């Protein structure tokens, strides 16, 4: 199995990418990794090149650049070359912690869209209080969705949750303003009617306040709604941890309490740590394309590689294609 990784993408590249790749190589004997980027910088952190190949390029896409224009103009950028490796059959999948918009553009223009899928979806795995997490799609790839798009998202998310996350008969919920069947705007009502007859375990409408309680294994929404929900959850979590830290450090007594509570607080922090869940899969493409978090450390990169390996090994893309074909959506 071969995975191409944009070694120059992310806040801590190339160090975090290289260290994460080496950790994955030690963990999985069937894995071969191509690191795409500046060879001189990559080799500063590469202590072993066992099953690791470097594809040198001096060019990269900056987060400040317009995504589509950058992908079209910078054919030799590390992210674009990683996607090209997939298109040329040199890699089974690719990963980048770089610009989300640029990776979506590279996925569409280079890797290519799966036949029958109208719009790809960006799908991270979000934490829950029980530590199991849930898959959420779409969170920004397609802000102007049609009912058929969300139907396809539900099917793709269900296949992923079962194949990669190991959840038998995953529960699929539709993000809405209430749990009653008739709730929502016209888009939500049409999607609800379609999902009732879909070949999935549809559990109905779910509200954003219940997401972290694990009300569903897969949560479906349009990209605009999903992005707002995602940012709200992230912001709330950061604010709560910040307030908690402020209170625990406010006096000598509270500092003593913090010392006693530290093991429990670390467990809580680990439960909410995105680095354990891998990256956000871009569903609807011909091959797995994974967006790692921009601030990924080496553990985050390792988790993204593990996730990508599972997608390839469990044949997620062929399975999605097969299910879609049976549903006469292709």
Curated annotation (Swiss-Prot):
GO terms for cellular component: cytoplasm. Its main location: cytoplasm. It comes from Bacillus cereus (strain B4264). Belongs to the PlsX family. Pfam families: FA_synthesis. It is found in: Cytoplasm. Keywords: Cytoplasm, Lipid biosynthesis, Lipid metabolism, Phospholipid biosynthesis, Phospholipid metabolism, Transferase. InterPro entries: FA_synthesis (IPR003664), Phospholipid_synth_PlsX-like (IPR012281). HAMAP family: PlsX (MF_00019). Catalyzes the reversible formation of acyl-phosphate (acyl-PO(4)) from acyl-[acyl-carrier-protein] (acyl-ACP). This enzyme utilizes acyl-ACP as fatty acyl donor, but not acyl-CoA. One of its GO terms (molecular function) is phosphate:acyl-[acyl carrier protein] acyltransferase activity. Pathway: Lipid metabolism; phospholipid metabolism. This is Phosphate acyltransferase.
């Amino acid at each position: 199995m071969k995975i191409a990784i944009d070694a120059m993408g992310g806040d801590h590249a190339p160090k975090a990418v290289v260290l994460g790749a080496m950790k994955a190589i030690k963990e999985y004997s069937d894995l071969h990794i191509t690191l795409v980027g500046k060879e001189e910088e990559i080799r500063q952190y590469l202590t072993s090149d066992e099953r690791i190949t470097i594809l040198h390029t001096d060019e990269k896409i900056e987060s400040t650049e317009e995504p589509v224009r950058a992908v079209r103009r910078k054919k030799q950028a590390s992210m674009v070359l990683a996607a090209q490796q997939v298109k040329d059959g040199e890699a089974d999948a690719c990963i980048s912690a770089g610009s989300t918009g640029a990776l979506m553009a590279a996925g569409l223009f280079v890797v290519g869209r799966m036949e029958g899928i109208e719009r790809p979806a960006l799908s991270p795995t979000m934490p829950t209080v029980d530590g199991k997490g849930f898959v959420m799609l779409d969170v920004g790839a397609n802000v102007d969705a049609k009912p058929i798009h969300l139907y396809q998202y539900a099917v793709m998310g269900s296949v992923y949750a079962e194949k990669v996350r190991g959840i038998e008969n995953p529960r699929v919920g539709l993000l809405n303003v209430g749990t009653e069947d008739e709730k929502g705007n016209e888009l939500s009502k049409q999607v609800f009617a379609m999902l009732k007859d879909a070949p999935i375990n549809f559990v109905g409408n779910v509200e954003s306040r219940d997401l972290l309680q694990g009300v569903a294994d897969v949560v479906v929404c349009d990209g605009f709604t999903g992005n707002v929900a995602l940012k709200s959850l992230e912001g709330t979590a950061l604010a709560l941890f910040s307030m908690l830290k402020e209170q625990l450090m406010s006096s000598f007594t509270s500092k003593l309490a913090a010392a006693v509570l530290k093991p429990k607080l670390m467990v809580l922090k680990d439960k909410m740590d995105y680095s354990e869940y891998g990256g956000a899969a871009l569903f609807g493409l011909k091959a797995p394309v994974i967006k790692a978090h921009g601030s990924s450390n080496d553990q985050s990169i390792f988790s993204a590689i593990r996730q990508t390996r599972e997608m390839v090994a469990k044949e997620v893309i062929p399975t999605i294609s097969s299910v879609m074909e049976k549903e006469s959506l292709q």
